[in-house]
């Protein structure tokens, strides 16, 4: 036994040193710029001869641990490598814990082009590194999106990618804002976003991922880890002269499972916050046009110049509340609820000269118009969606009410006081179910909508004129689609049934016009639409032929049966990873819009009457379009160009009768031909030499149409061209320049006259950062308007903004319209008339505000 104890003791003495010498070398590997952990990076310890002694792989959290034998490692080197990053190494010395930063690098594989410093691309996803495009003066993700090549942010906030409008706007794959993504772009801090993904050929239903149907384009914001699952946002408190205020609160809790956003805003500073509640995604906008829905008949909107920012002309008091929540109720299902309310009161003051080009003369009416438009809107919706692997189901219920009141006082060549009430109330239900059956798909969709549109107009001018309109409509649509997939081919049958039942009651009475108009009629139809489609898809080629056949039965105001036939061919070809072609061609007849038809004339404003009787003839159409796009992700170059043609011929003519102070519009049987051409192109490139981006855009519309004015048929042409070039450069850390140059041409021509306007615009923003937390921005805008028969008009605006950041608080002072410009002139063309308008502008204002970020 003594020998056994001695043997055990002897062995412990031998092996204990080896156990004691096991030493752990650990650490964390992260990505430069974003701070995100790098997964599956290879970590090695090498000796002086570069021989690998120990190796390991980082975890999802970017962590690693290597166990050594305890030898002297001070002269050894630790090395880290990972695809898409530059290798990193450092001497070990006496360290045992390491924080290693990997710098992204560019590499190329088949169909994969990556420049991870700024832009990466894989298959259908293009990713933008937010830190690669942001600067010290940027606050929101919208500020950074404008600097990303290939992404265009329009004046109204809508986002497009290389010429294509986005279908959805997501945060961590969740559609929290339901198309109202101005809330996200104008309020979410860019510091919370690691990268922006643009995903093409995207299907919102997982079961459709491998289908041959054409997907959409979505934008997805990827959150940094620090932003997930916690409340973040900003609060703003501002006041200034003359008697202006601006108060805002935005708070959001964002993650991949549960999301909430709360927006509360109020101001009278001219800042447009109403647009944050506008639906901007292509999918939602197209959904609004699926059914033939009635629109407001009375003209209640206020005129504003399209070239100016709304802050120049808005003289409004606005309140806005928007609350949205997405709650995950199971592994695949969510419940999305939303409610928003807006209350806006805007004052418009304009001087207007309308010229009517008649056969033997030109009739001009000059007036001053002062109007107060009040708008209130309430919308509430709830959506249940189950996006599983075996099926997709969604059901949405939505209620909305819109109340509008416009009081307008007109003086000049004719004088009156008019008050318009125009409301819309609706309840809408949309249901969708998709079920894969083997390689095939069955889709069922249903939509039911009921709405009422009460409208009133009262005009006082040497007597009183009253117009009352009440409309109701019920729309029901059921759609059934079955798709057979056969390797490269797919064949589908789409069957749709639509029922529309509507009623209109209108009554016009006047003291000074010895006429009354009354109508109480129903406009109903039942339609069956069958559309077989054949799709071919192989590698980068996709071709689809649709042959829809529509049968309509009308009763009520007009009784008839009609058949419409509009075949369409779409072809797209991904020629290479950089070039893509697309063409579209359709030819046939389409059903007329009847839910906005009425026989008795309706007074739409204080000087216009309109009637829209149903003409029992359909319109023959030809449409064609061709587009080409180029993307070079490595060199950050994006370009696209497209041209479209349309030709239409129907058996109805638009008629216009100008008499004294009134204008009458209607329709009558006849032959009418219209032609149009659209040209669109854009180019954007990131240039590292200037630390910025250059861009160029061109948009042109060339249209020909015919109108029957005062009994004479007149062919006329309207042309519109908009071109612009821009430069954004972060010249130094302390200096950023943004310059835009634009040139627009609008013209109207017919046999007896030709007139046009030209507009040259320049906008320059210069931001100075003398110290890290102080930003001084000087903004200047120049508008040069050139008119055919009037002197040119030059207008210069200037704004100054100073911002100082103290920890998480911005102290901001802004001086708007420094030169105190009073008015702005603009001309627009409508059929055979032109409107020369002088708009009253907001005067000079000063606003001091505190913005706290959390």
What are these regions (language model features)?
Residues 20-22, 61-63, 83-96, 116-403, ...:
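Membrane-proximal, glycine/serine-rich, low-complexity loop/turn segments characteristic
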Residues 33-47:
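Short, ordered, surface-exposed loop/turn motifs in non-cytosolic proteins
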Residues 48-51, 71-90:
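A short, solvent-exposed loop/turn motif at the edges and junctions
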Residues 49-63:
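Short, acidic Ser/Thr/Gly-rich low-complexity loop/linker segments typical of extracellular
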Residues 92, 209-210, 273-279, 347-363, ...:
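Outer-membrane beta-barrel translocator domains and adjoining extracellular loop/strand segments
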Residues 326-344, 372-557, 567, 574, ...:
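Face-selective signature of the C-terminal outer-membrane beta-barrel domain
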Residues 724-743, 751, 755-854:
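Conserved C-terminal beta-signal and adjacent last beta-strands/turns
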């Amino acid at each position: 036994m003594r020998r056994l104890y001695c043997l055990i003791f002897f062995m412990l003495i031998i092996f204990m040193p080896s156990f004691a010498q096991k030493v752990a070398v650990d650490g964390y590997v992260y990505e430069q710029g974003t701070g995100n952990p790098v997964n599956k990076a290879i970590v090695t310890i090498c000796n002086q001869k570069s021989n690998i002694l120990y190796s390991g792989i980082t975890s999802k959290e970017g962590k690693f641990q290597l166990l050594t034998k305890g030898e002297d490692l001070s002269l050894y080197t630790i090395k880290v490598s990972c695809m898409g990053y530059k290798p990193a190494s450092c001497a070990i010395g006496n360290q045992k814990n390491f924080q290693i930063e990997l710098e992204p690098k560019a590499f190329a594989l088949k169909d994969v082009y990556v420049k991870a410093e700024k832009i990466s691309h894989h298959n259908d996803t293009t990713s933008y590194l937010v830190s690669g495009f942001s600067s010290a003066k940027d606050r929101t993700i919208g500020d950074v999106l404008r600097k990303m090549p290939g992404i265009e942010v329009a004046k109204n906030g809508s986002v497009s990618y290389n010429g294509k409008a986005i279908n959805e706007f997501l945060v961590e794959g969740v559609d929290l804002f339901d198309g109202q993504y101005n809330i996200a772009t104008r309020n979410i801090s860019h510091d919370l976003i690691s990268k922006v993904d643009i995903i093409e050929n995207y299907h919102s239903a997982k079961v459709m991922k491998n289908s041959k149907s054409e997907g959409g384009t979505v934008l997805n914001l990827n959150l940094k880890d620090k932003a997930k699952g916690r409340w973040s946002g900003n609060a703003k408190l501002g006041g200034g002269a003359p008697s202006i205020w601006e108060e805002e609160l935005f708070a959001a809790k964002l993650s991949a499972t549960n999301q909430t956003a709360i927006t509360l805003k109020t101001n009278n500073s001219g800042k447009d916050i109403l647009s944050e509640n506008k639906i901007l995604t292509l999918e939602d906008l197209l959904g609004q046009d699926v059914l033939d829905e009635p629109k407001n008949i009375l003209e209640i909107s206020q005129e504003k110049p399209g070239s100016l920012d709304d802050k120049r002309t808005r003289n409004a008091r606005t309140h806005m509340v928007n609350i949205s929540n997405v709650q995950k109720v199971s592994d695949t299902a969510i419940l999305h609820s939303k409610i928003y309310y807006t209350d806006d009161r805007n004052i418009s003051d304009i001087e207007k000269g309308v010229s009517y080009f008649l056969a033997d003369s030109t009739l001009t009416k000059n007036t001053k118009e002062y109007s107060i438009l009040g708008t209130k809107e309430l919308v509430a919706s709830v959506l249940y969606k189950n996006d599983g692997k075996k099926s997709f189901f969604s059901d949405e219920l939505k209620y909305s009410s819109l109340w509008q009141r416009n009081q307008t006082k007109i003086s000049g060549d004719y004088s009156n006081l008019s008050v318009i009430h125009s409301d819309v109330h609706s309840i809408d239900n949309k249901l969708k179910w998709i079920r894969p059956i083997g390689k095939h798909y069955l889709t069922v969709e249903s939509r039911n909508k009921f709405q009422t549109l009460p409208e009133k107009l009262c005009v006082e001018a040497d007597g009183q004129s009253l117009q009352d309109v009440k409309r109701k409509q019920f729309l029901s649509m059921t759609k059934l689609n079955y798709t057979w997939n056969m390797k490269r081919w797919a064949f589908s049958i789409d069957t749709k049934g639509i029922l529309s039942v509507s009623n209109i009651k209108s009554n016009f009475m006047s003291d000074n016009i010895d006429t009354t108009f009354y109508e109480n009629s129903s406009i109903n139809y039942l339609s069956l639409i069958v559309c077989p489609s054949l799709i071919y898809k192989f590698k980068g080629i996709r071709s689809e032929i649709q042959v829809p056949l529509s049968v309509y039965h009308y009763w009520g105001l007009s009784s008839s049966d009609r058949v419409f036939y509009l075949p369409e061919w779409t072809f797209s070809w991904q020629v290479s990873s950089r070039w893509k072609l697309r063409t579209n061609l359709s030819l046939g007849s389409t059903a007329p819009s009847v839910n906005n038809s009425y026989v008795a004339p309706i007074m739409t404003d204080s000087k216009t009457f309109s009637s829209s009787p149903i003409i029992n003839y359909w319109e023959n159409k030809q449409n064609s379009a061709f587009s080409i796009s180029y993307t070079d992700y490595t060199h950050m170059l994006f370009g696209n160009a497209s041209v479209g043609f349309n030709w239409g011929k129907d058996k109805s003519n638009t008629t216009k009768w100008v008499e004294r102070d009134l204008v009458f519009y209607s329709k009558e049987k006849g032959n009418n031909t219209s032609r149009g051409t659209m040209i669109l192109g854009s180019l954007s490139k990131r240039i590292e030499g200037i630390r910025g981006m250059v861009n160029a855009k061109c948009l042109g519309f060339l249209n020909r149409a015919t109108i029957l004015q005062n009994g004479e048929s007149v062919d006329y042409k309207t042309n519109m061209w908009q071109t612009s070039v821009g430069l954004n450069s972060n010249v130094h850390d302390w200096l950023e320049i943004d310059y835009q140059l634009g040139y627009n041409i609008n013209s109207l021509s017919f046999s007896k006259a030709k007139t046009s306007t030209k507009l040259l615009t320049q906008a320059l923003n210069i931001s100075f950062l003398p110290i890290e937390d102080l930003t001084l921005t000087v903004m200047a805008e120049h508008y040069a308007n050139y008119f055919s028969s009037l002197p040119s008009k030059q207008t210069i605006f200037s704004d100054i903004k100073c911002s100082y950041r103290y920890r998480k608080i911005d102290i901001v002072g802004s001086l708007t319209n420094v030169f105190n410009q009073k008015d702005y002139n603009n001309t627009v063309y409508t059929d055979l008339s032109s409107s020369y308008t002088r708009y009253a502008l907001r005067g000079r204002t000063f606003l001091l505000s505190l913005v706290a970020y959390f």
